[in-house]
UniProtKB/Swiss-Prot annotation:
Pfam families: COA8 (PF10231). This is COA8 family protein Y39B6A.34, mitochondrial. The keyword Methyltransferase does not apply. It comes from Caenorhabditis elegans. It is found in: Mitochondrion inner membrane. Belongs to the COA8 family.
Amino acid sequence: MSSISSSSSNVRMDRRFDWVGPPDNLSKIRKIMLRRVDNESELERQYRLAREELNQWNSDFWAEHNQLFDRQKSDFVERKQQELGRLEHVSANELSEFYRDFLNDRHVAMMAYNKEWYRRNLQLIWPALKVNVVRFFRMARR
Protein backbone atom coordinates (compact mmCIF):
# COMPACT_ATOMS: atom_id res chain seq x y z
CA MET A 1 0.00 0.00 0.00
CA SER A 2 1.43 3.37 -1.03
CA SER A 3 0.73 6.57 0.79
CA ILE A 4 0.39 10.21 -0.04
CA SER A 5 0.49 12.94 2.51
CA SER A 6 -2.61 15.06 2.96
CA SER A 7 -1.95 18.77 3.35
CA SER A 8 -4.26 18.91 6.36
CA SER A 9 -2.74 15.99 8.27
CA ASN A 10 -0.23 13.16 8.04
CA VAL A 11 -2.76 10.45 7.23
CA ARG A 12 -1.62 7.43 5.24
CA MET A 13 -3.94 7.06 2.30
CA ASP A 14 -4.53 3.96 0.22
CA ARG A 15 -3.65 5.08 -3.31
CA ARG A 16 -5.98 2.51 -4.87
CA PHE A 17 -8.98 4.76 -4.18
CA ASP A 18 -10.13 8.35 -4.53
CA TRP A 19 -10.58 10.07 -1.17
CA VAL A 20 -13.32 12.55 -0.29
CA GLY A 21 -12.51 15.12 2.36
CA PRO A 22 -14.67 17.32 4.56
CA PRO A 23 -16.58 20.25 3.04
CA ASP A 24 -14.53 23.36 2.29
CA ASN A 25 -15.33 26.22 4.66
CA LEU A 26 -16.17 28.65 1.85
CA SER A 27 -17.44 26.60 -1.10
CA LYS A 28 -19.08 23.85 1.01
CA ILE A 29 -17.79 21.44 -1.67
CA ARG A 30 -15.96 18.32 -0.50
CA LYS A 31 -12.40 18.13 -1.79
CA ILE A 32 -11.73 14.96 -3.79
CA MET A 33 -8.20 13.62 -3.81
CA LEU A 34 -8.03 11.53 -6.96
CA ARG A 35 -5.85 8.46 -6.87
CA ARG A 36 -2.50 8.48 -8.63
CA VAL A 37 -1.49 5.01 -9.65
CA ASP A 38 2.22 4.20 -9.82
CA ASN A 39 2.09 3.24 -13.50
CA GLU A 40 -0.17 6.13 -14.53
CA SER A 41 -0.13 6.61 -18.30
CA GLU A 42 -0.03 10.04 -19.93
CA LEU A 43 -3.69 9.61 -20.90
CA GLU A 44 -4.63 8.79 -17.30
CA ARG A 45 -2.59 11.73 -16.01
CA GLN A 46 -4.28 14.16 -18.42
CA TYR A 47 -7.72 12.84 -17.45
CA ARG A 48 -6.94 13.09 -13.72
CA LEU A 49 -5.63 16.65 -14.15
CA ALA A 50 -8.75 17.62 -16.13
CA ARG A 51 -10.97 16.25 -13.36
CA GLU A 52 -8.92 18.05 -10.70
CA GLU A 53 -9.21 21.28 -12.69
CA LEU A 54 -12.99 20.83 -12.99
CA ASN A 55 -13.30 20.17 -9.26
CA GLN A 56 -11.23 23.27 -8.46
CA TRP A 57 -13.25 25.43 -10.88
CA ASN A 58 -16.47 24.17 -9.27
CA SER A 59 -15.17 24.85 -5.76
CA ASP A 60 -13.96 28.33 -6.75
CA PHE A 61 -17.36 29.23 -8.22
CA TRP A 62 -19.24 28.14 -5.11
CA ALA A 63 -16.75 29.82 -2.77
CA GLU A 64 -17.27 33.13 -4.59
CA HIS A 65 -21.05 32.62 -4.71
CA ASN A 66 -21.29 31.76 -1.01
CA GLN A 67 -19.08 34.69 0.04
CA LEU A 68 -21.27 37.05 -1.97
CA PHE A 69 -24.39 35.50 -0.44
CA ASP A 70 -23.05 35.81 3.12
CA ARG A 71 -21.94 39.41 2.57
CA GLN A 72 -25.26 40.48 1.03
CA LYS A 73 -27.29 38.62 3.65
CA SER A 74 -25.30 40.27 6.43
CA ASP A 75 -25.87 43.70 4.86
CA PHE A 76 -29.59 42.94 4.46
CA VAL A 77 -29.98 41.81 8.08
CA GLU A 78 -28.07 44.86 9.34
CA ARG A 79 -30.30 47.23 7.30
CA LYS A 80 -33.46 45.50 8.50
CA GLN A 81 -32.33 45.62 12.12
CA GLN A 82 -31.67 49.35 11.80
CA GLU A 83 -35.18 49.80 10.39
CA LEU A 84 -36.80 47.61 13.06
CA GLY A 85 -34.61 48.46 16.02
CA ARG A 86 -31.62 46.47 17.26
CA LEU A 87 -33.63 44.11 19.50
CA GLU A 88 -35.92 42.87 16.75
CA HIS A 89 -35.04 39.81 14.68
CA VAL A 90 -35.46 39.68 10.94
CA SER A 91 -38.45 37.49 10.13
CA ALA A 92 -38.42 34.41 7.94
CA ASN A 93 -40.68 36.24 5.46
CA GLU A 94 -38.21 39.10 5.17
CA LEU A 95 -35.34 36.66 4.70
CA SER A 96 -37.32 34.81 2.04
CA GLU A 97 -37.59 38.10 0.12
CA PHE A 98 -33.82 38.48 0.37
CA TYR A 99 -33.28 34.90 -0.87
CA ARG A 100 -35.65 35.47 -3.81
CA ASP A 101 -33.97 38.75 -4.78
CA PHE A 102 -30.49 37.27 -4.42
CA LEU A 103 -31.32 34.32 -6.67
CA ASN A 104 -33.03 36.59 -9.20
CA ASP A 105 -29.95 38.84 -9.29
CA ARG A 106 -27.70 35.80 -9.73
CA HIS A 107 -29.87 34.12 -12.37
CA VAL A 108 -27.59 34.96 -15.32
CA ALA A 109 -24.46 33.89 -13.44
CA MET A 110 -26.11 30.64 -12.32
CA MET A 111 -27.27 29.83 -15.85
CA ALA A 112 -23.76 30.49 -17.18
CA TYR A 113 -22.33 28.25 -14.43
CA ASN A 114 -24.77 25.43 -15.28
CA LYS A 115 -24.00 25.67 -18.99
CA GLU A 116 -20.24 25.62 -18.36
CA TRP A 117 -20.55 22.80 -15.81
CA TYR A 118 -22.39 20.60 -18.33
CA ARG A 119 -19.94 21.51 -21.11
CA ARG A 120 -16.91 20.61 -18.98
CA ASN A 121 -18.42 17.36 -17.75
CA LEU A 122 -19.51 16.28 -21.22
CA GLN A 123 -15.98 16.93 -22.49
CA LEU A 124 -14.71 14.40 -19.94
CA ILE A 125 -16.82 11.52 -21.27
CA TRP A 126 -14.51 10.59 -24.17
CA PRO A 127 -11.29 10.80 -22.10
CA ALA A 128 -12.99 8.76 -19.35
CA LEU A 129 -13.94 6.06 -21.83
CA LYS A 130 -10.37 5.91 -23.20
CA VAL A 131 -8.90 5.72 -19.68
CA ASN A 132 -11.28 2.93 -18.71
CA VAL A 133 -10.30 0.94 -21.80
CA VAL A 134 -6.61 1.36 -20.87
CA ARG A 135 -7.35 0.22 -17.31
CA PHE A 136 -9.41 -2.73 -18.53
CA PHE A 137 -6.56 -4.01 -20.71
CA ARG A 138 -4.04 -3.39 -17.93
CA MET A 139 -6.11 -5.54 -15.55
CA ALA A 140 -6.70 -8.19 -18.23
CA ARG A 141 -2.93 -8.62 -18.64
CA ARG A 142 -2.49 -9.47 -14.95
